[in-house]
Amino acid sequence: MKKISVVTATRAEYGILKPLIRRLLACEQWETQVIVTGTHLEAAFGNTVQEIEGDDVPIYRRIPILNTENDASGVDDAYAVTLTMAAALRGFGAYFREEQPDLLIILGDRTEMLAIAAAAMNAQIPIAHLHGGELTQGAVDDCVRHALTKMSYLHFASAEVYRERIVQMGEDPSRVYNVGALGVENIMNEKLMTPQELAASADFPADQPYAVVTFHPVTLEQGTCPQQEAAVRQMHELLDAMRARPDLFFLITKANSDAGGRQINELLEGETADEPNMKLVASLGMKRYLSAVKHAQFVLGNSSSGIIEAPALGVPTVNIGDRQQGRIMAKSVIGCEPERSAMIAAMDQALRLSERIRVDRQLRERLRVENPYGDGHTSEKIMAVLEQYMKLDRIDLKKKFYDLPDLQHQ
């Protein structure tokens, strides 16, 4: 029987992949191997492997890769990220050598995925990549994402403009599909919690006005060296802006493991402990997170969930800085600089928009319809393509560069 491997390394990634993983596991045409790695296996990031176990997803293998070596420059500087990539190359190289899956499914733009894809490429294992063609000009993710595109054989884009961009990079249009975003599918199909259920589960006052906050380090912030200093400085600005709104409660999820992430989390642990209107959690899990966003006044930070999931729920987003610059953004996304006064003004604007959405049903529905990331049937569309390709005796990995028609004779 043929084998498909699907890799998840972070809480956000697993939440997005969940509907696809369910369909993969239910398919009897092949064996699905779920490989868990990265921050899932680390206590500092909430041991989010427990969420996967709680969903009764069979974990085929756990491959620890995250560097926890503490040195004078911090545990998550650029060198530590490099060490994590090296561990991923070694660990997944051994896995691919042993198992030889017929297809590897990866999502997004994280550096560990670059190493995992390189190991698969060396083992001549075809790669199916989700969320290629996107832009996040404030992060190193752009370079990683585009490299993953060139290493992959099948491409599942979340919007038409991203599908076109993948083709623009020389990928054969017959292997590039606009399927929408799995995050939108989660919203449409997951039974989310009521405010009362959420308050009991997450232990915060969900019945009063609140915002959901996630702020990750910006890995390509110009003129910032080291990156940790920029991350901490911007987080201080955000904390000061939140303190200016004592009438709001702030539910804060920890930053990711990018360079500067641990410094942000350490700052949050120290600064929020005595704040009556702030609660810090390592991870909410997909269902609680989406439930929290659904009932929030707005989403605050620089996470892609504010660009994809929040608009699909009809919730405004205050998008801080340029980490998500280049993505398609709904009209409910309000951009601002990572400075206290700009953040306060953007929060005020988001609150006004939130009130308009609350009382104007037509506006609420219009904002949801204008969400550019698909119709909620993404996993079904991906499965249809996979079933077609998995019937082939073999996949020819030799790829011809596709020149755009209007450039071929210039």
Where are these regions (language model features)?
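Nucleotide-activated sugar donor-binding and catalytic core shared by glycosyltransferases
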Residues: 1-410
